[in-house]
């Protein structure tokens, strides 16, 4: 027999909390650029892919959500270590690593007579990344496309409209702009000149 509570729950308009699916990640359109599409790794996130390709997901400064590079302790020590032979005879603070010091003792009494504190900054463990082959390919493609200047071609309807204006006014663009019937959108004289010059060029009109 079903309990009173179960019957009330069955009649209730409030839906029970069912299992919810995790929100799917937004699909990234990588096919718009064939170079990026060819080098994209679907198993990585957007930021991981961009970093691997030598690109940046955001132009501004990243706030949180950044993965720190994994650096082994031995590698870190090697990069920051300065051999003793390089600093044992120097009195220049800029050649002694910051956080370290050189003690100069009296040869007779062995007492410390001078302490030279180091001012040399430690090298960053993150080297400046080299320009990747993907970035080079993208730059080459951008340069090629920049050289190719595509001219805008007027549509058939626009060509007919320009032809009517030219047949009526010739090269008098000041009169053209005041024609309320033909120049419905009130194009300026300079704009009409540019359009008709291009139209004449396409139609081989001198």
Curated annotation (Swiss-Prot):
InterPro entries: Ribosome_biogenesis_Nop16 (IPR019002)
Renumbered residue ranges of the record's region Disordered: 1-20, 69-97
Biological processes per GO annotation: ribosomal large subunit biogenesis; rRNA processing
Pfam family, one: Nop16
UniProtKB keywords: Nucleus, Ribonucleoprotein, Ribosome biogenesis, rRNA processing
Subcellular location: Nucleus, Nucleolus
Domain of life: Eukaryota
Entry GO terms, CC: nucleolus; preribosome, large subunit precursor
Keyword Ribosomal protein: no
Subunit annotation: Component of the pre-66S ribosomal particle.
Family: Belongs to the NOP16 family.
Function: Involved in the biogenesis of the 60S ribosomal subunit.
Name this protein carries in UniProt: Nucleolar protein 16
Gene: NOP16
């Amino acid at each position: 027999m079903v309990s009173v509570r179960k019957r009330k729950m069955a009649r209730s308009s409030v839906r029970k909390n069912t299992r919810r699916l995790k929100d799917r990640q937004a699909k990234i359109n990588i096919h718009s650029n064939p170079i990026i599409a060819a080098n994209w790794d679907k198993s990585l996130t957007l930021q991981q892919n961009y970093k691997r390709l030598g690109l940046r997901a955001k132009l501004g400064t990243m706030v949180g959500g950044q993965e720190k590079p994994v650096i082994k302790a031995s590698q870190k020590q090697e990069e920051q270590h300065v051999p003793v032979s390089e600093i044992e005879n120097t009195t220049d603070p800029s050649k002694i690593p910051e956080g370290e010091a050189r003690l100069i003792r009296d040869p007779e009494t062995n007492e410390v007579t001078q302490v030279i504190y180091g001012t040399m900054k430690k090298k960053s463990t993150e080297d400046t990344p080299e320009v990747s082959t993907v970035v080079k390919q993208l730059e080459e493609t951008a340069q090629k496309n920049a050289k190719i200047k595509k001219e805008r071609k007027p549509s058939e309807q626009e060509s007919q409209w320009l032809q009517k204006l030219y047949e009526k006014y010739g090269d008098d663009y000041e009169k053209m702009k005041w024609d309320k019937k033909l120049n419905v959108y009130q194009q300026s004289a300079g704009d009409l000149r540019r359009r008709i010059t291009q139209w004449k060029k396409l139609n081989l009109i001198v």
